[in-house]
From Swiss-Prot:
Membrane-traversing stretches: none
Stored Pfam families: Ribosomal_L16 (PF00252)
HAMAP family the record matches: Ribosomal_uL16 (MF_01342)
Name of the protein: Large ribosomal subunit protein uL16
Source organism of this protein record: Shewanella piezotolerans (strain WP3 / JCM 13877)
An example molecular function term from Gene Ontology annotations: rRNA binding
Amino acid sequence: MLQPKRMKFRKMFKGRNRGLANGTEVSFGEFGLKAVGRGRLTARQIESARRAMTRHIKRQGQIWIRVFPDKPITSKPLEVRMGKGKGNVEYWVCQIQPGKVLYEMNGVSEELAREAFALAAAKLPLKTTFVTKTVM
C-alpha cells in the first residue's frame, strides 16, 4: 500500500479539506476518473480500486495513479481514557477536492476503460465521473 517513506513529523493536525483541486486535467493517459465530490481516500481504497481496474483490463494498457496518501490519521486504542497524548498512526489518507483526476488509463478501448473505471468507482467513497483527454 502507498505511504510516505519518511516524514519530518510523524503526526499531523486534522485540518480542513477546502479549496480547489490541482491536477484537474488528464495529462498522462487518454481516459481518466475524476472526483466530483470532496472527501478523503485511504491507501487501502486507492489500492483496491487499482486492483479492480488492473484485473478488468487483463494487464493490457497502462494505469497511472494520480493521488498519493501523505496524511497520517491517528486513533487511540479501544477503552482508553481521554488525554495522555495523541494516538498512534493507524492509516494514511489523501484529501480530495472536486475536479481532481484520481486515475488515468491508456492503451485500451473507451468501452473497456469505462467498465474498468466503473468497477474502481464502486470501491471509492466519492462520486466520480469518466473523462477523456481534451486535445487543443
